[in-house]
């Protein structure tokens, strides 16, 4: 399967106390073992931050969204695995995979070399181009060539933050201003609309969803040219090779039988599937 680096992503790789995770994972492993002994199936715990919509979110107290429903379809009628979702902070997604608390995660996760060294990437389930967002009355930013001296908000550890940090290394004479935050994407977009900073780089689907749902009509979206196809992937803990093979096969089947297309239309309002060759 071809791996493709995504331009930006919502997420931030943070730190969680190792002792707390170790204590939690010990208890959860015992619970999982009890569940497996009862059902005869292996329990797979899938972590998510339940954001951004429409990829992952809560509705009436229940998790849903494109990636959540794809996972449900992957494990539907499996005679080997039972799937369970657990909501956690973004930093907890990765820390939980590290501690074997979770076997899998879905959270609009992009491909990076650093993550590929620590985790297993399943086949991609969606494509999600990146865009530049500014206020409609701001004509000073028309492309990435114009962000020098302009300000944005980023979450520490995201691929967008790292990309802009690299931009600043290459443009020391006129760097872009990075304001680090722990706010979620909806809050960040609201502050952009209020004029608290100048621009935001993010995923097209997430941007268009927030603009529509929050009524941020004073923002405009600028397409970013890229010869790389930004994809979204399920991520698995190291050592879960057998699970990865199962997930990859099921994603291929769901692509061929039209399930992925149906879910894409339902949650994205259009076809945002990877190229078939990249799923194999």
Residue ranges, per PLM feature:
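C-terminal motif of bacterial Sec signal peptides marking the signal peptidase cleavage site
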Residues: 19-23
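Extracytoplasmic small-molecule ligand-binding "clamshell" domains
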Residues: 36-108, 257
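Periplasmic-binding protein-like
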Residues: 49-50, 127-134, 212-249, 268-280
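Extended ligand-binding regions for polar small-molecule ligands
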Residues: 68-78, 138, 145, 150, ...
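Ligand-binding cleft/hinge of the Venus flytrap
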Residues: 71-80, 160-182, 211-216
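Acidic, polar ligand-binding/catalytic clefts
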Residues: 72, 84-146
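Short helix-initiation/N-cap motifs at beta->coil->alpha
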Residues: 84-95, 139, 178-191, 228
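A ligand-binding cleft/hinge motif common to bilobed small-molecule-binding domains
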Residues: 92, 109-117, 163-166, 193-194, ...
């Amino acid at each position: 399967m071809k791996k493709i680096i995504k331009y930006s992503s919502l997420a931030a790789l943070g730190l969680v106390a190792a002792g707390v995770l170790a204590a939690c994972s010990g208890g959860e492993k015992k619970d999982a073992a009890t569940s497996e002994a009862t059902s005869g199936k292996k329990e797979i715990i899938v972590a998510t931050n339940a954001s951004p919509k429409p990829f992952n979110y809560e509705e009436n107290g229940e998790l849903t969204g494109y990636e959540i429903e794809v996972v449900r379809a992957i494990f539907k009628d499996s005679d080997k695995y039972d799937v369970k979702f657990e909501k956690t902070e973004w930093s907890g997604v990765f820390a939980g995979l590290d501690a074997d608390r979770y076997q899998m995660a879905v959270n609009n996760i992009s491909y990076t070399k650093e993550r590929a060294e620590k985790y297993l990437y399943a086949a991609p389930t969606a494509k999600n181009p990146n865009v530049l967002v500014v206020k409609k009355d701001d004509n000073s930013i028309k492309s990435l060539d114009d962000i020098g001296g302009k300000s944005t908000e980023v979450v520490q550890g995201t691929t967008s933050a790292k990309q802009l940090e690299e931009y600043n290394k290459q443009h020391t004479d006129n760097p872009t201003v990075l304001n680090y935050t722990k706010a979620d994407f909806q809050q960040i977009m609201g502050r952009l609309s209020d004029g608290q900073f100048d621009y935001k780089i993010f995923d097209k689907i997430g941007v268009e969803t927030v603009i529509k749902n929050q009524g941020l009509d004073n923002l405009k979206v600028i397409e970013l040219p890229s010869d790389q196809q930004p994809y979204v992937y399920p991520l698995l803990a190291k050592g879960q090779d057998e699970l990865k093979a199962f997930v990859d096969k099921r994603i291929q089947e769901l692509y061929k039988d039209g399930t992925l297309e149906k879910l894409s239309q339902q949650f994205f309002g259009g076809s945002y599937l990877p190229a078939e060759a990249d799923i194999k």
